[in-house]
Design a protein with these regions (language model features):
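Histidine-centered nuclease catalytic patch
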Residues: 17-51, 61
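Residue-level marker of positions within ordered structural domains that often coincide
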Residues: 11, 23, 59, 77, ...
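Long, hydrophobic, amphipathic alpha-helical segments used as structural scaffolds
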Residues: 14, 65, 114-117
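Zinc-coordinating Cys/His ligand positions in small cysteine/histidine-rich zinc-finger domains
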Residues: 54-57
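Polybasic, low-complexity binding patches
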Residues: 39-49, 59-97
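Charged phosphate-binding loop/patch that engages nucleotide di/tri-phosphates or the phosphate backbone
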Residues: 87-117
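Short, charged surface segments at domain edges that flank catalytic/cofactor-binding sites
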Residues: 1-17, 92-96
Length: 117
C-alpha cells in the first residue's frame, strides 16, 4: 500500500517520472524504488528514501544506485543521504497497532490521491 500511495501522490495526470532515468510512464507501470536497498525495517517504510522508479531501473539495473544518489543529493542533501544509509543497519520492530495505523494511513492517502483499494 505504501508503494501505491507514493506512486499515486507522485503522479501528474496519472503519469510518474522515474527519478533515476527520467522516463515517464503511467503510475501503474512505475515502482516505488528505495534509495537504500536491502529491505531492512529501519528503512523499508522511511518515505524520505522511496521515490518512483521504472521497472528497468529498479529491478533490471539494481536500483541505479549512482543515479539515485545524485537525485537524493541534489534534492535532499548529504545529511539525509548519510542518515538513510546509517538507518539500514538499524532494526525497527513495529507493534501490531503501529502496523495497522500505517496501513490505515496508506489507505487514506490512496483515497485522497484518487486511487482505489
Amino acid at each position: 500500500m505504501l508503494s501505491k500511495a507514493i506512486r499515486l501522490e507522485s503522479a501528474r495526470s496519472g503519469i510518474c517520472k522515474c527519478v533515476t532515468f527520467g522516463c515517464s510512464k503511467p503510475w501503474k507501470e512505475i515502482q516505488a524504488g528505495h534509495f537504500v536497498g536491502g529491505r531492512t525495517n529501519g528503512i523499508l517504510f522511511d518515505e524520505r528514501g522511496i521515490f518512483p522508479q521504472c521497472y528497468a531501473c529498479n529491478v533490471c539495473r539494481q536500483g541505479m544506485g549512482p543515479e539515485y544518489t545524485v537525485f537524493m543529493l541534489e534534492n535532499y542533501g548529504q545529511g539525509l543521504v548519510d542518515e538513510l544509509i546509517q538507518k539500514r543497519r538499524q532494526a525497527v520492530k513495529f507493534t501490531a497497532t503501529e502496523l495497522k495505523e500505517m496501513i490505515e494511513g496508506y489507505k487514506l492517502r490512496i483515497k485522497e490521491a484518487g486511487g482505489t483499494l
